[in-house]
Every structure is written in C-alpha cells, then in structure tokens.
Amino acid sequence: MLRIRLTDSPISLAGYWWATLVGFAWGFLWSTGPIELRQGLIVFTGMPKWTFGRGGSCVGGCYLTDRNAGDVVLGHEAVHKAQWRRYGMLFPVLYLIAGRNPLGNRFEIEAGLEAGGYVLRRRRPERPAR
C-alpha cells in the first residue's frame, strides 16, 4: 500500500518554500521599511496595512507587518513559521477551518495568545507590605 504523507514531509516542505517565495515577493514589492533576518524569519516592515492581516502575517518564512516586530511577537511568528513547515500549503486551509477567532484557533493558541497580542499579559498580584 502506497502511503503519502502530507505533513512533515517533502511535500509540506515544498509548500513551505513556495509560501516563503510568495511572502518574499509580496514583502519585497510593498515594504517601505527595513528588511531584516530575525529569529529565523525574514521580517518585512513598513508594509501598508491592507497587505497583511491583523498586526502582521506570517507567510512561509516571511513575516509581513507595518511596525509590529518586537521580540515577543517574533517568537509567536516563529511558531507560525514552524507550522508552515509542518503543514506546507495545507496550513492556510487548516488555519481557515480553525476559525478567525484567535481565542479558539488551535494554531494561534499553539503560538501563544499573549505573545500574539490577543490577550493581555497577566500581572502578578502584588504582595501586601509587611
């Protein structure tokens, strides 16, 4: 029996590289800010708001944003990059099926809702003075 693996496979890796090429072309076309390699991502800043979703979009190994490129957010986006590598071109389909609400989207939950800016960071309660 021939079994075709679609995740963590040469097929998904090809999809990841295709998405990275598309993300790179889109970022190169529209970015007006610095283009940097940070946390394993090609980060395109200065993008017009209509060229990406929410605070930024990870497409393959590229992160597209206007200026939302802090270290915490890039850690979140690095998880999305790993998801692109695992699922390849299945990732955008699976992401849409998971839903647009980040609080219920398994991919956003895996990447970290706090790091992605979807929920406020919890503050530690202050201890009463003795």
Could you describe each region identified by the protein language model?
Residues 1, 117-130:
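Charged phosphate-binding loop/patch that engages nucleotide di/tri-phosphates or the phosphate backbone
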Residues 2-37, 85-97:
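A transmembrane-helix-recognition feature enriched in membrane-embedded lipid enzymes
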Residues 12, 16-19, 72, 105, ...:
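A structural signal for well-ordered alpha-helical segments within the folded catalytic domains
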Residues 32-45, 102-118:
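Membrane-interface alpha-helices
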